[in-house]
Structure formats: structure tokens, C-alpha cells
């Protein structure tokens, strides 16, 4: 039982300190695009860069999706900034 409670606590701590979402351009407010064939490598590099500090990234629905970013990371949609408007 103690092992279960400890595992549950570790999972909850991981959920609190990790953020998932689409990378966003601060200039346009749009998602950072990618292509399905080569996008996974590109997105992984972008997501794990020093700018975003994510754990992993991949191309999903023609946009870069990141997992494990810090809570203060900006992801799509940005407040007060709509894409293309």
C-alpha cells in the first residue's frame, strides 16, 4: 500500500510541474508548423531547446506538440493574440 501511495504522489507531482501543448509563435500567435515526414525531428529539437525546455516533441496535425515543458511556457493559444487576426 505504501508503494502505491508513493507512486501516486510521484505521478501527481509530475503532472503539476509539466505542461503539454503546441508551440506558438509570439509574433503571430499561430502554432509552429511542421511537415509529417520530417516534422518529428524538427519538433523534437525545437521542444527540447533551451528556449522551451521540454522533454519531447513531435509533429501532430501539422504543428509541433511538446510534452514536459515548464509551467511558465507559452503554448497555443496565447491570451489576447489570435492567429491571423
Swiss-Prot record:
Highest taxon of source: Eukaryota
Range of residues in the leader sequence: 1-18
Tissue: Expressed by the venom gland.
Cysteine amide modification, residue list: 83
Matching PROSITE patterns: LCN_CSAB (PS51863)
Keywords from the named record: Amidation, Disulfide bond, Ion channel impairing toxin, Neurotoxin, Secreted, Signal, Toxin, Voltage-gated sodium channel impairing toxin
CDD domains noted in UniProt: neurotoxins_LC_scorpion (cd23106)
Similarity-based family: Belongs to the long (4 C-C) scorpion toxin superfamily. Sodium channel inhibitor family. Beta subfamily.
Function: Beta toxins bind voltage-independently at site-4 of sodium channels (Nav) and shift the voltage of activation toward more negative potentials thereby affecting sodium channel activation and promoting spontaneous and repetitive firing.
Domain free text: Has the structural arrangement of an alpha-helix connected to antiparallel beta-sheets by disulfide bonds (CS-alpha/beta).
Identification of the protein by name: Beta-toxin Ct6
Organism: Centruroides tecomanus
Highest classification ranks of the organism: Eukaryota, Metazoa, Ecdysozoa, Arthropoda, Chelicerata
Amino acid at each position: 500500500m505504501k508503494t502505491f501511495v508513493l507512486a501516486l504522489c510521484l505521478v501527481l507531482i509530475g503532472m503539476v510541474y509539466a505542461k503539454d501543448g503546441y508551440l506558438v509563435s509570439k509574433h503571430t500567435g499561430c502554432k509552429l508548423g511542421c511537415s509529417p515526414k520530417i516534422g518529428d525531428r524538427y519538433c523534437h529539437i525545437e521542444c527540447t531547446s533551451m528556449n522551451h525546455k521540454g522533454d519531447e516533441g513531435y509533429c501532430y496535425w501539422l504543428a509541433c506538440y511538446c510534452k514536459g515543458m515548464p509551467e511558465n511556457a507559452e503554448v497555443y493559444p496565447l491570451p489576447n493574440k489570435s492567429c491571423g487576426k
